[in-house]
Structure formats: structure tokens, C-alpha cells
């Protein structure tokens, strides 16, 4: 398996009868962001990806922060690394503490660790301004330093405006847009490919 997780199949090649896998090499491209309008399949995709990580990445630890707090991740209730709604701050803190423990040598392991945050933008909008800025700062540290310690971030939300990530948005090396994307979203996240995306 190495350091790869299959994300899906190449649609163009599949249309020609060639099932070619699209893989995420998390050692080279540590962080992912998934975005799309309501009903675009973000939750389905992220649940499938988390299941693949759990099955195929040895000793993976996944911290799930479900700010939406509906039934999509309710099956995780009771799990120690599952945080809903207001408790998502605890999940973010746990990920930062994991990074700090690996930095200072208290945790010498380098096993795969993923912070998954569903509806990051809604979470920030829920917080007061000072708390939101602190949350963005903490996420930025994970995005900028996590790769060296095998710590990864997966964010799922409707829009990926820079305001939600400070200067760290460019640290998302895998960007997945689902559903019918607006021209603005295409220009913002896929400017190099905007002519190819219809």
C-alpha cells in the first residue's frame, strides 16, 4: 500500500473502459480540502475516504470534528476521537497537542494521524471573532508543520474562501471540488484549469 490511498477513478479513462485509479500520496501531498454546494456529495466522499484510510493505512488515527452534528457521523458516538458541534474545539486542540508531542519528542511515533473537520467555515462563523482567529491560527500551524510529523488535515465545506484559512490555504495540496461549481469557485481554486472545467 505504501503511502497512497485511492480517491476514485479517472472519469475520462473509465469512459473508454480503462479503470485508472486516482491516488492520494499523503507523504507528498499531506492536506486535502473538499468543497461543493449542499447536496454535492461531500459527506459521502469524505466518509468513503475515511473508511479507506481506516482499512488501508496501518495504525492510522483519525480525529473527526463534525460541526454539523447531524446523523452522518452519529455512528462514531462514544469514540474517543469524535467531536460534535461545540466540542469540535477539543478535537482541534487534540490535533495540535499531537503535533506538539511529536515535535518535542514526547510522542516518537510517526504513524498516520488525520484531523478531519466537517464544515470548518460554519464552525468559524459560530465562534466569536477572537476564538475564530485563534482556531485559524491553530489550523495554520497544522497545515504548515504537520507533514514532517505525518499529521494531515482534511477539511470539508461549501466554499474555500481564503478568509477561513489566513495565509495557509495554499498548503492544501489536494483540492477536490464536487457538484456543479460556480465560475467564482473554479477561478478561486482551479485557475490553471478554468478553461477545461465546464
Where are these regions (language model features)?
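The conserved Walker
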Residues: 37-38
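Conserved ATP-driven motor cores of ASCE-family P-loop NTPases powering translocation/secretion/packaging/pilus
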Residues: 157-198
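Hydrophobic positions on the alpha1 helix immediately C-terminal to the Walker A/P-loop
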Residues: 45
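Loop/turn-to-beta-strand initiation segments
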Residues: 59-61, 110-114, 146-155
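Mechanochemical coupling/switch segment within NTP-driven translocation systems
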Residues: 61-64, 68-117
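N-terminal pre-Walker A segment at the start of P-loop NTPase domains
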Residues: 1-21
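Conserved lysine of the Walker
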Residues: 42
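Substrate-engagement module of ASCE P-loop NTPases
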Residues: 91-103, 134-158, 181-182
Amino acid at each position: 500500500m505504501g503511502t497512497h490511498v485511492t480517491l476514485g477513478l479517472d472519469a475520462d479513462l473509465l469512459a473508454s473502459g480503462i479503470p485508472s485509479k486516482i491516488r492520494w500520496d499523503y507523504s507528498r501531498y499531506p492536506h486535502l480540502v473538499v468543497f461543493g454546494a449542499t447536496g454535492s456529495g461531500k459527506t459521502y466522499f469524505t466518509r468513503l475516504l475515511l473508511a479507506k484510510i481506516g482499512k488501508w493505512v496501518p495504525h492510522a488515527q483519525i480525529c473527526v470534528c463534525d460541526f454539523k452534528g447531524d446523523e452522518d457521523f452519529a455512528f462514531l458516538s462514544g469514540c474517543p476521537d469524535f467531536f460534535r458541534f461545540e466540542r469540535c474545539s477539543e478535537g482541534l486542540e487534540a490535533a495540535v497537542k499531537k503535533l506538539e508531542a511529536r515535535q518535542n519528542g514526547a510522542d516518537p511515533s510517526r504513524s498516520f494521524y488525520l484531523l478531519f473537520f466537517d464544515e470548518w467555515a460554519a464552525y468559524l462563523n459560530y465562534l466569536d471573532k477572537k476564538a475564530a482567529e485563534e482556531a485559524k491560527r491553530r489550523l495554520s500551524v497544522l497545515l504548515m508543520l504537520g507533514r514532517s510529523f505525518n499529521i494531515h488535515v482534511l477539511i470539508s465545506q461549501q466554499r474555500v474562501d481564503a478568509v477561513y484559512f489566513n495565509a495557509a490555504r495554499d498548503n492544501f495540496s489536494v483540492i477536490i471540488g464536487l457538484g456543479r461549481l460556480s465560475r467564482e469557485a473554479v477561478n478561486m481554486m482551479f485557475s490553471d484549469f478554468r478553461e477545461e472545467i465546464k
